[in-house]
Amino acid sequence: MRDIVFAGNLIVDHIKCIEALPPRGELAKILHVYRSTGGCVCNTGIDLAILDPELAIGAVGVVGRDADGDMVLETLTRHGIDVSQVLRRSVTSFTDVLAERSTGSRTFVQFGGACAEFDIDDVPLDKLDCKLIHIGYVLLME
C-alpha cells in the first residue's frame, strides 16, 4: 500500500532566462535555457520524497510520448516515486517560463498537452491502494 498518491498535472517547465521582458514586437536575447519538472504531481511528490524517503509515493497522470515525458518519468523514478499508473500519449504538457534576471519576475505561457486529456477514466480507482490521494491543479485540466 502506498502512503500517498499524487494525481493531476505532470508538466515540464522550459525556462528561458532573459535580461528583461521586451516590449511587444521586440526581441530579447536568451541568456540561458534549462528544463525542470513541474506541476502538482512532480513538485509535491518530489518535495515529499525528499523530506521523507521512507514514504511510499505514487503518481497518476498522463505524459507525452516524447523526451519531456521521458524526463518526467526518469525524475520521479529517481526520487523513488512509483510511476506505474502514469499513462503515455500525445505531447507532454509544458510551460514556457520567461525569467527576467533584472527583476526576478517570471512570465508563464502554458500548453495543455497530455494533461488536458487527463480525466477520471485515467484514474485506476481499483488499483490505487493508498492511504491518501491528492489531486492538484484541477482548474488547469480541461
Question: What label would you give each PLM region?
Answer:
Residues 1-11, 73-88, 100-142:
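Ribokinase/PfkB-type carbohydrate-kinase core domain
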Residues 1-60, 67, 71-77, 130:
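Glycine-rich phosphate/adenosyl-contacting loop at the front of the ribokinase-like
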